[in-house]
Regions:
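Hydrophobic packing residues within well-ordered alpha-helices of enzyme cores
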Residues: 1, 62, 81-82, 137, ...
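Class I S-adenosyl-L-methionine
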Residues: 1-75, 174
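Short, charged, surface-exposed secondary-structure boundary motifs
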Residues: 1-3, 19-26, 80-82, 109-110, ...
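Active-site catalytic pocket residues across diverse enzymes, especially alpha/beta-hydrolases
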Residues: 4, 85-86, 141, 145
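Active-site donor-binding loop signature of nucleotide-sugar glycosyltransferases
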Residues: 13-15, 102-103, 157
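A contiguous loop/helix-start segment that scaffolds small-molecule binding in enzyme catalytic cores
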Residues: 26, 37-41, 54, 95-97, ...
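Class I SAM-dependent methyltransferase SAM-binding "motif I" and its flanking Rossmann-like core
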Residues: 46-121, 164-167
Length: 225
């Protein structure tokens, strides 16, 4: 935004869970309207426009209107947000797969997905936009057989100066959410990769946190032995 000339018009069209936001159809129509006036329009999104970002809907509207466009990929919060929290999305000692899901569908209701299949098939689950239905999601995961002591983390305002990370478990997270007043925007991760944060929280280390290498103790033994 700072690179754009000062006289460039800026229109806010962001979305925040649980707060008044522009309707998606109005955003798409506004982009088309401006483009038809001969304007060069930049639709700036957080994360990646094609990962739960509704970029596909807006691009489809442009196609229908016969307006050419380009897509510049970004770093989705399920990857970048966890990296800023010191939590790797994958690690060969913990998981060979990961599942990204959204906490609600197009109607705003909890996602009608097969939680049992996801729980059985994915060691790590990353949930976008989960806070509105977090109680239901936690219950779905527990009913699907995920253990109550499974590590879980909430990354709030990821990569921002006011970023906070709450480590918890599937069994205690609802109490911890209330205690710590966790609110959106938050990215939620469930799985053993959360435990790796004590050795990989690079941002915390910059502020004096002592990191503990518990990832490859056998490698450390070979190096020092």
């Amino acid at each position: 935004m700072d690179l754009a000339p000062k006289q460039t018009p800026r229109e806010f069209a962001g979305k925040r869970g649980g707060k008044p936001s522009y309707k998606q159809v109005d955003i798409s129509l506004r982009i088309v309207q401006l483009a038809r006036k001969g304007k060069r329009v930049l639709r700036l999104k957080g994360g990646d426009p094609f990962v739960f970002g509704r970029g596909g809907e807006e691009a489809a509207a442009l196609v229908s209107a016969g307006i050419p466009f380009r897509i510049i990929p970004g770093i989705t919060s399920g990857i970048g947000g966890l990296a800023y929290a010191g939590i790797p999305l994958t690690h060969r000692d913990t998981n060979q797969s990961v599942t990204l899901v959204t906490g609600h569908d197009a109607t705003g209701n909890v996602s009608q997905i097969d939680w049992k299949a996801i729980s059985d098939g994915s060691p790590v689950i990353v949930i976008y936009m989960a806070m509105k239905h977090i109680e239901r999601i936690v219950q779905e995961l527990r009913d699907a057989g995920r253990p109550t002591n499974e590590p879980m983390a909430f990354v709030c305002n990821a990569s921002m100066p006011n970023q906070t990370v709450m480590e918890t478990t599937l069994g205690t997270c609802l109490e911890d959410i209330k205690k710590n007043q966790i609110k959106p925007p938050s990215i939620v991760v469930v799985g053993e990769v959360v435990n790796l944060r004590q050795g990989l929280d690079w941002l915390g280390a910059e502020n004096g946190k002592l990191l503990i290498n518990n990832i490859h103790p056998q490698i450390m033994e070979k190096q020092t032995g």
